[in-house]
């Protein structure tokens, strides 16, 4: 039994590719034209492809249990940097860690963990995403985006000011 989309629904097929031996660079393609390819900095700078498509990674990195276990004792910014480094290969892990510490540090979040997981009762936990400057879950992304966008402009040689509007 499969899923059939109702008439009028626009469903995209994801075009994930197998990572070639020795390949480490992640590219992003447009959901409207797989021939449109770019690196992470260009994708972050653009937001959407020029053809109106979403920019999607060409592959999903494989994460094993050992990788996840190595994240357990680390601070939130380190976890964010390690995971983002799998997708943003044109940024160094050191850059991502700096961005993460700027985005999720005590100047921005009122909890030193940024996104703590609290036990509610046996077998039930709550991920608290309201400790940021606006007390909304979107702070998790919107504190990091300006750092990534500013770096993307530098990496692509653009000298302009970017404005991020969020609702």
Task: Give residue ranges: language-model regions.
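N-terminal amphipathic/basic-hydrophobic helices that include classical n-h-c signal peptides
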Residues: 1-24
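PLP-dependent amino-acid enzyme catalytic core
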Residues: 12, 22-167
